[in-house]
Amino acid sequence: MAKVSVVSLHKESRRTESNKYKGYPFLANGEKNDYPTMIELLVGGSATAKACAGVIADFIYGKGFSLEAEARATARQQRTRFRKDTLYINDKRETPNDLLKKVARSLSYHRGVFVQVNYNQLFQKTSVQVLPYRYCRLGARDSNNYRGKVLYYENWDNLQDKKEVDKNVKAIDLYDPSPKVIQEQVDAAGGWDNYKGQVYFLNLDRNDSYPLAWADVVLLDCESEMLSTKYTRNGFKKGFFGTYAFVTSTMNSDEDREDFRDNLRNSIGVEAEQSVFHFELEMKGDKLEDQVLVKPIESNVKADLFEYADKKTANNIRKTYGNIPPVLIDFVEGKLGNTSGDSLKEARIFMQEQMQEERQDVQEMFEELFDNFAEPISSNGLFEIMTNY
């Protein structure tokens, strides 16, 4: 797993790397070019951030595209089986709804998504699929101030030998459906068999580089919540919280000392090793309690302070995700209790309005991507996302 660290926001930079892969310099994403991976690790490790990302994805996806629901309804009315294969949009047997789920998830973590489009020799689109966000980097601008490439590589966080990277990096053209442009790209690639299609990049920040994630300003809070969970887990796993001192009489030899410490490790488990200290003292008495003493070392982490910090951290995270109402996070985590149906409904309506712009961006992207598709998916060219209210 890649090793990442939280970055100071004032030091965060988007820069063009001097290294060229496939002949193209690229725009690094983050101070160490590991920003997307860092986001996925920290959001995935924070219960609140992960729940918030799930809420964002749900309200972008809604109930899916109306065209797919209508096709299913028509099949039911005709008392025939719904032929899902009529909506397949790539060789992964995905439908527009399947693609929408992946788009929503990428946007819920990164506020951006990369989508690959392939063409046939009639310049019709033949397949559309989402690329993993963390594998994609924008190419640098050329002498004409044009950014024409996306570099695709599956291990940006662990760059190896430059020649090895260069061999595995894929340079894919940015989206431009003009037949003239496509033909020029095909010729440059050495023919249709070598052509990799194009990549559409939806950036919710609408800037000239990469968007900042929803969790960007609360990365430290995400890390704190992740560490809090780990602290609690380790406490239960090893059977006690805090740090302890084991005091014994002086060992007769190094061998006796190592045997004692090995037995101690085996009894408390590897997870607790760093929470136990062994001290040797001249102790009097023949009884066991006179020879071995176990003393807790007082921790400055108080339960009430711990609870306050956890709540404050969770609230900070929630606010950065469009100020998601707490009731929706409780719903995701199964903690609704006596929450009224009205408050849940109001919260859903609020989030539906909050995500209206994002859904509109996604609808327009789909309408663009499936324009001139070889097998028409939408009879009127529209891709309307159904909402809950």
Would you name each region that the model predicts?
Residues 146-166, 170-173, 256-339, 364-377:
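Long amphipathic alpha-helical segments
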Residues 347, 353-355, 360, 364-387:
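Alpha-helical oligomerization segments
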Residues 115-119, 239, 328-334, 380-384:
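Short coil/turn segments at secondary-structure boundaries
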Residues 103, 107, 249, 320-321, ...:
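Generic structural signal for hydrophobic core residues of well-folded globular domains
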Residues 47, 56, 60-61, 70, ...:
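Hydrophobic/aromatic-lined pockets within catalytic cores
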Residues 30-47, 247-256, 285-316, 338-358, ...:
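Extended, non-catalytic structural segments that build the interaction scaffolds
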Residues 2-50, 54, 58-64, 80-284:
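Structured, contiguous alpha/beta core segments that scaffold functional sites
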